[in-house]
Amino acid sequence: MPAAVIGGIATHYEVTGDGPPLLMFSPGGFSATLSNWTSLGIYARLRLVDHLARSYTCIMFDRRESGGSGGRVERITWPDYAAQGKGLLDHLGIPRAHLMGGCVGCSAVAVFAASWPDAAASMVLYSPAGGARYRITQQSRFAQHLSYYSERGGAAVVDLAQTSGQVFTKDPRLGPWASVIRADPAFADRYRHQDPAGYQTIVAGMARLLFDRDTVPGPEPEDLLRLQIPALIVPGQDASHATSAARYLEECLPRAQYWDVPVSGQTERTAPARVLEFLASAESQ
């Protein structure tokens, strides 16, 4: 798998298919890997990549601190996640692309479009993460990690990450840098010996700013209201992907199309066809 260094952090990515570029921000929360597009939940069932790659050049990547990508201990923000995707386009020499996000990737897509509107041909926002229960769950996850770190220290987190094979979403004690600890011995050593008070301040701020609302986190509504970029919104319907989050995006995006179909009606026959129909219409505008 090829890798690009973006903002000093290695990004593992994959390009498949042929046609106009489609930059895909992976689903999967704090384990947002490119493989999730073909192996995780609804995305595996719909086989979206198989269908999209027939008409588009699909550019997928492991989000920073996920999978084979690297990371850095800092107060990570949604603009940081969006900048990783923009940096990948720059690395590939692509000035403009369609954007697609699944789950948590929708937040990064919306921030990307608000930050670099000229680089965004359209947005597909599939099952956006958000909602009150989503916020509560995420903040609780960070609180559990901080409690474990405070009691046991960085060395215990490193030892746990290197022996458990789990990720932050499955075991909150690990924190959001577990995959980097596991893959990079030098990073693990720095993590083990970092300043505890400074680290806890970083993590507390990260949790507060990433998950600060009971809808789609990331983009500010005032920025979305000004975006003149075609968008297709496909709703989710569970504790992490509240339908209200999708409706919020519909309310805020002036050129939004809302595919009002329940998750049970989103099938391999219907969903890829709807996404392809939207992308084709955006191409013609």
Please give the residue ranges for each predicted region.
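Short beta-strand/loop motif that positions the catalytic acidic residue
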Residues: 226-227, 233-235
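Catalytic active-site module of serine/aspartate enzymes centered on a nucleophile-bearing elbow/loop
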Residues: 254-285
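Conserved HGGG/HGGXW glycine-rich cap/lid loop of the alpha/beta-hydrolase fold
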Residues: 6-70
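Conserved acidic catalytic loop of the alpha/beta-hydrolase fold
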Residues: 79-97
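Gly/Ala-rich beta-loop-alpha elbow adjacent to hydrolase catalytic centers
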Residues: 101-109
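Hydrophobic, aromatic-rich cap/lid helix
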Residues: 178-219
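Flexible "cap/lid" loop of the alpha/beta hydrolase fold
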Residues: 114-115, 119-152
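Conserved alpha/beta-hydrolase "acid-adjacent" motif
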Residues: 239-245
